[in-house]
A protein has these predicted regions:
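N-terminal type II signal-anchor transmembrane helix
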Residues: 2-36
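Electrostatic cytochrome c docking/interface patches
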Residues: 31-57, 174-205
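Gly/Gly-Pro-rich "capping" loops immediately C-terminal to redox-active cysteine motifs
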Residues: 44, 68-105, 124-133, 159-171, ...
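The canonical Cys-X-X-Cys-His
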Residues: 53, 58-68, 140, 200-203, ...
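C-terminal capping alpha-helices of c-type cytochrome domains
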Residues: 104-117, 129-154, 264-280, 288-317
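Extended amphipathic alpha-helical interaction segments
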Residues: 187-192, 212, 218-222
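Long compositionally biased, domain-poor regions of proteins
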Residues: 206, 233-234, 270-273
């Protein structure tokens, strides 16, 4: 009996030492870095491509990165009470040291594909576009390099995200739960606009990332395979504005009771471009007014959403609590 207890005690002591060693490794060793493999990028110079890049940057990127100086200098994105703590978005102006001025076009493309910055550290995947066409990604980078006022250099600097000092986040990163997105460097093309449903899927899940807000949570979205995101297009995601007021994203699956299954295509177009619901009320301001979208784009998104499995999730019930 004494021998068994002794063996058990030794085993327990070894286990405790292993746990202490693992905790010390998580807490005190450097964060992992990854090899940066910038692809070759040919930036477009035509006005149509710049306009396309402007759409994404000003409709999507600006929501998080537009600072108080009117430039893409970053802003406070989450408060200390947030599960991941206080976090500021990055300065992505053309400043040579405080923005993205040091990045090559290839390094920017690799960052947008994988979430790995030029120093080999993971900073994504919130802003990643792993399935965007090479042509469209180049249009975004071309606009980031343009003479647009919002992209001009800003001196703004921000504190490092609080989550970087979190033991839990460090553990998730070091054990590979949080990791960069894969990228094999193979060419990626967008579907043609003539294939309306495929084109609509591309716009809704990649180019404009509608699913990002309209699925269950930013934290559980799956950028590589958007359809596997929990609550895909069924809403329920608390979306904050610049003053941290939140509204719950709506179910936009074809559910007739809780989604947009009873809407017409024209009503959907009015909601997306003008922010007007079928009953005449206005959408909350967290939902951007996509007035610059072509009708063809909105109709393609509508056609694709009709193919999404209906969900009976009722986000309004969550909001009412």
């Amino acid at each position: 009996m004494k021998k068994a207890l002794k063996i058990a005690g030794i085993g327990f002591g070894i286990l405790v030492l292993l746990l202490i060693a693992t905790a010390a490794w998580v807490q005190f060793t450097p964060m992992p870095t990854y090899e940066v493999k910038p692809p070759t990028v040919q930036l477009p110079v035509d006005s149509a491509s710049l306009a396309k890049g402007r759409k994404v940057v000003e409709l999507a990127c600006a929501h998080c990165h537009l600072g108080e100086d009117g430039k893409m200098s970053g802003r406070l994105f989450s408060q200390a009470t947030d599960p991941f703590g206080e976090m500021w978005t990055a300065n992505i102006t053309q400043h040579p040291t405080k923005g993205i001025g040091r990045y090559t076009d290839g390094e920017l493309a690799y960052l947008l594909r994988t979430g790995i910055n030029r120093d080999g550290r993971v900073v994504g995947p919130m802003m990643c576009h792993p399935n965007m066409s090479d042509e469209d990604l180049a249009s975004i980078i071309a606009y980031l390099r343009s003479d647009s006022g919002i992209m001009q250099p800003s001196e703004a600097t921000h504190p490092a995200p609080a989550y970087l000092s979190s033991f839990m986040v460090k553990a998730l990163i070091k054990f590979g739960v949080f990791k960069p997105l894969p990228y094999d460097g193979k060419p990626i093309s967008a579907p043609p606009a003539t294939d309306q449903i495929a084109y609509g899927r591309y716009l809704a899940t990649e180019f404009y990332e509608c699913y990002g807000c309209h699925s269950a949570s930013f934290e559980t979205n799956n950028p590589m395979e958007p359809e596997k995101s929990p609550g895909f297009f069924a809403g329920g995601n608390p979306v904050p504005d610049e003053e941290f007021n939140t509204c719950i994203s709506r179910n936009i699956t074809p559910s007739k009771e809780h989604g947009i299954g009873s809407w017409t295509e024209e009503q959907f177009l009015s909601a997306v471009k003008g922010g007007i619901r079928p009953d005449g009320s206005m959408l909350q301001h967290q939902m951007p007014r996509f007035a610059v979208l072509d009708d063809e784009e909105v109709r393609a998104i509508w056609a694709y959403l009709q193919t999404v499995p209906p969900s009976e999730n009722n986000p309004l019930r969550v909001e009412a609590k």
